[in-house]
A protein has these predicted regions:
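Canonical Radical SAM [4Fe-4S] cluster-binding loop centered on the CxxxCxxC motif
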Residues: 1-10
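Conserved AdoMet/S-adenosylmethionine-binding subsite of the radical SAM
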Residues: 11-189, 194
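Radical SAM enzyme core and accessory elements
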Residues: 200-202
Length: 202
């Protein structure tokens, strides 16, 4: 359907308030509906209301905002918000990431990581990286070693995500054994890594 416009803060909040399960919510994630940093003013306003005493009075640690890394905007978010941060990496090698994600050409993953190293993620705020594992694309030992080198010194975690086949898309996911091997290698080399529970296979 493509991009149609950015939601104002009120509409972002209404997406939450209108959920039938709103009273049972424990966490909120800004992910999968466009790039939050491209609508930063409204995202910051919405998270401010969610965490303010006059709003929901939630702790910022119950909210995660995802980003591919947008120059200047990510820095502003890190300075003005205490919410958790999830960075969509998907490939640690810049030239390959640019093929998967054109945003790499704007603010590369190496620049993103260098920026993140200026902030403290050892206490309440958590930093995570999202990584969809594609067969024969980003699942090799070369990629695992590049991840370890790239995030060295960062207090972070990695979430490996299974890819489910999409019609007419040539990309493929890997089997469970490969996912576990990739996870174990990263974990053994100091990068805390989990495999996200899959809800999309059906």
């Amino acid at each position: 359907q493509g991009f149609e416009g950015s939601l104002p803060a009120g509409d972002i909040l209404n997406q939450i308030y209108s959920l039938p399960e709103v009273d049972k919510l424990t966490n909120i994630v800004f992910m999968g509906q466009g790039e939050p940093m491209d609508n930063l003013d409204n995202v910051l306003r919405a998270t401010e209301i969610l965490t303010a005493d006059y709003g929901w009075a939630w702790s910022p640690k119950r909210i995660t905002v995802s980003s591919v890394g947008v120059k200047n905007k990510l820095k502003r978010f890190l300075e003005e918000s205490e919410c958790h941060v999830a960075i969509s990496m998907h490939d640690p090698i810049p030239s390959e990431r640019a093929e998967l994600m054109p945003a790499e050409r704007g603010m590369g993953i190496e620049q993103v990581v260098e920026l993140l190293k200026n902030y403290d993620f050892s206490h309440q705020r958590r930093l995570s990286f999202e990584y969809i594992v594609f067969k024969g694309v980003n699942d090799s030992m070369q990629h695992a070693k590049a991840i370890i080198k790239l995030v060295k010194g960062l207090d972070c975690r990695f979430n490996l995500i299974r890819f489910h086949q999409i019609p007419d898309i040539p990309l493929q996911g890997v089997n469970d054994e490969k996912m576990e091997q990739f996870r174990d290698y990263l974990t053994q080399h100091g990068v805390f890594t989990t495999i996200r529970a899959s809800r999309g296979q059906d």
